[in-house]
Amino acid sequence: HDRPKFCYLPADPGECMA
């Protein structure tokens, strides 16, 4: 996980962008 991105399913908190 480097840059934040939109949440995908299944998504990790570190991969979610508000």
UniProtKB/Swiss-Prot annotation:
Residues marked Reactive bond for chymotrypsin (site): M17, A18
Organism of this sequence: Daboia siamensis
Taxonomic path: Eukaryota, Metazoa, Chordata, Craniata, Vertebrata
GO molecular function, one term: serine-type endopeptidase inhibitor activity
Subcellular location: Secreted
Cited function: Serine protease inhibitor that inhibits chymotrypsin.
Domain BPTI/Kunitz inhibitor as annotated: residue spans: 7-18
Tissue: Expressed by the venom gland.
Name of the protein in question: Kunitz-type serine protease inhibitor C9
Keyword terms of this UniProt record: Disulfide bond, Protease inhibitor, Secreted, Serine protease inhibitor
